[in-house]
Amino acid sequence: MNPFVSPCEFTRRDVLCVAAACAAGLLTGGPAQATEAPAFEIVDPPQVISWKPPLYHGWPTLARRKNGELLLVWSGGRESHVCPFGRVEFMISPDDGRTWSWPQVLLDGPIDDRDAGVVETADGSILVTTFTSLDYQPMLEQAEKLQPGQPGAWEPLRLREWQAVQRRISAEQRQAELGTWMTRSTDGGVTWSARYATPVNSPHGPIQLADGRLLYCGVELWKPEHRVGVCQSTDDGLTWDWLATMPIRPGDDSTEYHELHAVETASGKLVAHIRNHNPVNAQETLQTESTDGGKTWTTPHSIGVWGLPSHLLCLRDGRLLMSYGHRRPPRGNQVRVSSDAGQTWSEPILLTTDAYSGDMGYPSSVECEDGTLVTVWYERLKDSPLAQLRQTRWRLKG
């Protein structure tokens, strides 16, 4: 979840922003024409894979290890989209998502642990990322002003639980807990390091490059500069150095760039996607590219895709796959394919169109040995306010 953007709902303001974006596209020529979407088939229909439905699950990331295991991380143990109870959870599938292990809690600090990313490094280590947030505090402060029986007043137990969280540490200590974090396992996820700070955060975390480096495109959270850029690690994720600051499109505000993810193409070119909340191309995914290993990047530009945030994957045949949430009708999860290293993208493939609300998305995808694709996302279902993890298995036919 982007900590600077109110969650999920598509408002009248959004409609006006999208209309402005469309007008701007007509004036400037807009993105390249989309190509026809390849044929696909659903192998296994969407299903809930959460082990604990009475709790809220959000913002997952799926990755595949070299040994074929699937890794899934998310923010679990939650009461709602914004609350103080979030913790980073992790589970493994040995059979391409057909079965999953019982969740393991990796991080559970005194404030909210949110969106989780995961990657396996070239050395076989597993890196998991997250960020911490105090966005729940204004909600608690407002609730404490209301008397029982007043409109909007909380149930007494809920109020006591939130207040108990606040009493764990002081206000100064809570501020010190804000940060962007990583934890690391070198034994396949059995044991984990203490968390350590990273310069940036993005929901799906860093990527492994062919030259051995790890690349992390993201945003500096909780810092005045709020830089949008790229960090690299040359020691298996132990330490991170700032590599480049992303250029800003003329007229844009960099604080409206969020939730980046990148992929290395077969040629070595890097493609990164950005969640955009500027008035032009609002709620769209912007794209930027690098041909020098991430040292410099092109000015972000529209690719004509409404929906966010994007997760990128390079398929074995060299094509790129972007997966993203679509929070207006047809509400659900979509993917697009690029056969030319991101120069153009196909029309959308509609993986799901049955989402009950905008509290959903953040899909990520992996390619299995047999060529099938597994996509996992989070979604608030019709019969409960507690969002769950959902999964589908599918295949490109062309």
Residue ranges and their predicted role:
Residues 13-14, 115:
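Positively charged, low-complexity intrinsically disordered regions
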Residues 26-37:
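Bacterial Sec-dependent signal peptides at the C-terminal "C-region" and cleavage site
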Residues 1-10, 17-25:
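N-terminal secretory signal peptides
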Residues 6, 18, 28-29, 211, ...:
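Generic detector of low-complexity/intrinsically disordered segments
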Residues 12-13, 92:
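Short, cationic motifs built from Arg/Lys/His that form the positively charged side of catalytic pockets
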